[in-house]
């Protein structure tokens, strides 16, 4: 049926984000917000690692047929995430907070244990 692939990708993305939240909590991160949206873009997870704010992009794939998940965090996507992060910081009046951008790449084959790669400081603030 037309459009099913998009729903499958959304479901896979939601599963990946849930896996990422559990993973980050296991590392003692505090989850502050999920799926922050603004006109500039979206941030999957906003967390705190000690005193550092962490803006996390989660990419989940069933396989590497189209490359490893983290390759989907293109320069364009980095700019969108950066703009959304600046918006979030301004809304919370936290512009001076220490922050970084992480990527969590998840390979989640059907009925298999997911492979998780956490890339800290994956990219710098992009304009």
Swiss-Prot record:
SUPFAM superfamilies per record: Restriction endonuclease-like (SSF52980)
Stored InterPro entries: Restrct_endonuc-II-like (IPR011335), tRNA_endonuc-like_dom_sf (IPR011856), UPF0102_YraN-like (IPR003509)
A molecular-function term among this protein's GO annotations: nucleic acid binding
Cystines in this chain: none
CDD domains, A to Z: PoNe_Nuclease
Pfam families: UPF0102
Family matches, as HAMAP family: UPF0102
Matches recorded under NCBIfam families: PRK12497.1-3, PRK12497.3-3, PRK14675.1, YraN family protein
Similarity-based family: Belongs to the UPF0102 family.
Protein name, UniProt field: UPF0102 protein Geob_1494
